[in-house]
Amino acid sequence: VNWVLFLLPAAALVVAAWTGGMETLSTATLAAAEGAVPLALGLVGVMALFLGLMKVAEKGGLLDATARVLSPLLLRLFPEVPPDHPAMGAMVMNVAANLLGLGNAATPFGIRAMEHLESLNPVKGTATNAQVLFLAINTASVTILPTSVIALRSGLGSANPAAVVAPTLIATLVSTGVAILSARLLQGGRSVPVAVGTSAPLWGLAATGLGLAGLIAALVAWGQTIGHWIIPSLVVALLGFGLWRRVAIYEAFVEGAREGFAVAVRIIPYLVAILVAVGMVRASGALALVLEPLGRVTQLVGVPAEAVMMAAMRSLSGSGSFGLLAEQMKNAAIGPDSFSGVLLGTIYGSSETTFYVIAVYFGAVGIRRIRHALACGLIADAAGLVAAVIACRVLIA
């Protein structure tokens, strides 16, 4: 990450000097640094809400119960983590939130999972294999319901706003599989034997799989309607579960929510570093300088130039990629229902802002040496792009 942090601004400086855009670069650098603080503080309310709800679920035993049901799978993915460790339940909550397209909820759950994983870290400041794998799964971002894309398509008058659901699911399943495989191959060293501990029978995992398949079918069929119900239902369900388990839900909620501000402040230095580097590359024109000729090459194998631009922008900037998506869909030559419109929505919905996720998740626990996490994230992003193109070719074209 040290080399990445140097090379991005250095490339931006060279390109800006060549094109005469130094004034723009200077302004963008300061704007990116200033923007990190409101971005972090903007997370405070959402973090407080979902960390509070998570504390209620934790005290009620929901996280432990969920981890036990999924233990046959979790123990193979994360053999370094003890079977009954609270990190297991926190990771499940994070993946579930991503699955439903609840990015705002997934971040607090993911940070809590990272904190639990850090408690097992023998070398503080260096990411463990479990932390790298968990982050890689997050950058792949398995998603059933890409809510923001569906909302944008609906607002632009799409005849079928939920058309992106099926290709997005396929692309995220592929990118997640590649993320897991790349993390395993790049971690080095010997494999850790699967721990033995309290585990649910395999029928519990099978029942969960069937339930997930039913949920996928429901979201594909009625995703646009169901999407508005998810967050209110989640709040009521978790608080209701706490009452049923005789948890003092107000005290538990406040205890968890109190951590929201501290976490947001803790990630500011990491956000500044990433956002400044990314902002300089975008403002200098270095990104376009690389991607425009690359797009002409990828078009020869069926990958549109705008898809390459979207994939690269998505890895670097959430707001930038969403702005690009909206701009392209408003273009009369593309529109939301064309092949390119659906493809761009699928790429956005099936990937994550890799650099931002690394900054937030690792920054929250003070990880400075990220090992192979960035490589895994970018490999997963590339796999997701290829899968999105193929899925849209088969299902849409």
Give the positions of each predicted feature.
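Transmembrane helix-loop junctions in multi-pass membrane proteins
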Residues: 17-27, 58-62, 144-160, 215-226, ...
